[in-house]
Amino acid sequence: MNFQQLKIIREAARQDYNLTEVANMLYTSQSGVSRHIRELEEELGIEIFIRRGKRLLGMTEPGKALLSIAERILNEASNVRRLADLFTNDASGVLTIATTHTQARYSLPPVIKAFRELFSDVRVELVQGTPQEIEALLHNGGADIGIASERLSNDPTLAAFPWFRWHHSLLVPKDHPLTQVSPLTLEAIARWPLITYRQGITGRSRIDEAFNRKGLMPDIVLSAQDSDVIKTYVELGLGVGLVAEQSGDAREADTFTRLDTRHLFDANTVWLGLKRGQLQRNYVWRFIELCNAGLSLDEIKRQAMEPEEVAIDYQI
């Protein structure tokens, strides 16, 4: 048994048993992946996967138990590699934050400024992506901290801390007819072409749920990944925009009017995620504390380092 075999078992569950994707994620060949699985099953004397021909469909009960053990072993191996840095280089290094465009552009600047004043020898790297990509970066060690409104709080292998709650607001050109509608309703918004976030990011599910509850089907003419792109197309006259309320800036006042929609759409929560059970440098803990002053450093460490209490579930 070796670490590569355990990584393959873990990655197979993460990639929905698609061995091509497993090979891509681990920078190896599909034939090599299959060989490692076969050799591990022969060594242990169990079948790890449920198969249909050559295709993997899921995990057997022994396979599920092995996956849980593999996660713990690989996480502890990662901790061993981090141990020397923790004792020799705790106030300098690189803090890698995986986050969405909206948080990187509008929410993080004052926090990062305050962080740099505390840790001038720590360089900050921002990696922008979708919530799914952010979650993957936390799992594979590509990021120390993940920040997003979706996914992070639902993953039992991550420790998630709330940062702040936010709502969507409606961005319209100045003097648009909707500025005269009071109170603003979903029915009124649905009469206009709509521009908003694409599926899976920045609270798009809240928008869809609100319209669905009313039996409305808005004409979403364009969806995008970040607020600045949405603003560009609203300015061009393609439609009205539903954007995160924190995406406002002074420059838009001459072009747009923002309309309050807190009574129409449910609130969203921005979460900060860490890989559960993983040793971190002091400046990682302090960054979380800067974002959530209601938690002490001891409480943050306790929540992040405690083992998950529920079984790992990759839709096994």
UniProtKB/Swiss-Prot annotation:
Domain HTH lysR-type: 1-59
Entry keywords, A to Z: DNA-binding, Transcription, Transcription regulation
Tree of life domain: Bacteria
Gene Ontology terms for molecular function: DNA-binding transcription factor activity; transcription cis-regulatory region binding
Keyword Lipid metabolism: no
DNA-binding region(s), chain positions: 19-38
GO biological process entries: cysteine biosynthetic process
Family, similarity comment: Belongs to the LysR transcriptional regulatory family.
UniProt-recorded name of the protein: HTH-type transcriptional regulator cbl
Species of origin: Klebsiella aerogenes (Enterobacter aerogenes)
